[in-house]
Amino acid sequence: MKNITVKEMIKSAKENLTELSPQQVEANLTMQDVNIIDLRDTSELIENGIIPGSYHASRGHLEFFADPNCEYYKDFFNKEKNIILYCHSGARSALAAKTLQSMGYDKISHIKGGFKSWMKEVGIIVDYK
């Protein structure tokens, strides 16, 4: 088996992933059929805030929170909803999207450039509680 780099993994993940601009995500903030999920670690949320209305599922818990058959399942991972993922720069969210696709989620997208891009282009945040 060929070894691949994380850069190659991210590139591969993005090939089958819808990338949304921060402005496109901002337009979806109040939509009932959309769940925005922040994959950053808790310390990042405390330090930098979150996009309003987003849910938190750190990347390390993703598979457990997204599996309806797992005791740790979170109902904001709803296959009927459009799920928009984000992390700091878009790398973790691309990898997470690929994982969710393999788990049967087909309404997955992520913020191109992640939270960093969101802050530069939109800048609306709330404190994490």
Model-flagged regions — what are they?
Residues 1-34, 42-82, 91-129:
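Rhodanese-like catalytic fold shared by cysteine-dependent sulfurtransferases
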Residues 37:
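Active-site flanking residues adjacent to catalytic metal/cofactor-binding acidic residues
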Residues 86:
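Short, surface-exposed ligand- or partner-binding patches at beta-edge/loop junctions that are enriched
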